[in-house]
Amino acid sequence: MESIKTSHKFESILPKQKKFQSILPKPKWLRVKLPTGQKYTELRGLVDKYKLNTICTSGSCPNMGECWGEGTATFMILGNVCTRSCGFCGVKTGRPESLDWSEPEKVARSIKIMNIKHAVITSVDRDDLKDMGSLMWVETIEAIRRMNPKTTLETLIPDFQGIERHIDRLVNAKPEVISHNIETVKRLTRE
């Protein structure tokens, strides 16, 4: 093994070579498995065919192979570019493209093909839209209901900037579960 060459001032902060050899291997439960299997391949094909977004791909989730291998995914609507820049999130930030109004049907069709009994839908924040994307949320829920009447729906929604009429619009669509992540406390959020 080649020695690490350092200047004198850095020697105290760099670990000695012998320490590298004494580091324990990662436990098996911490290792991410490579995505494989028929279900993974089928799901990858659907996502590519219908140009769908999932939080799995957009958020660079390390568990994607495991979830997709079991035939589960969290669909992400309203595009794959968020108008916010949360420090805890891996989704791209910027100026989103215009809405794809065929997205609700594509998501519903994929859920039908996958025979999903419980679908999870999330979205990017769309502060650039007058309705914050609430109409697209309703359109997606209704499309899923039409094509998959027995599928239960879990919605992981943005805050819609706290505008009640947008939140009410989604609540009135009656998904079985409405949830909202609060990822961190204010004192830990970058200003």
Place the predicted regions along the sequence by residue:
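Conserved Radical SAM active-site core
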Residues: 70-188
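Flexible, acidic/Gly-rich N-terminal and inter-domain linker regions that tether
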Residues: 1-84
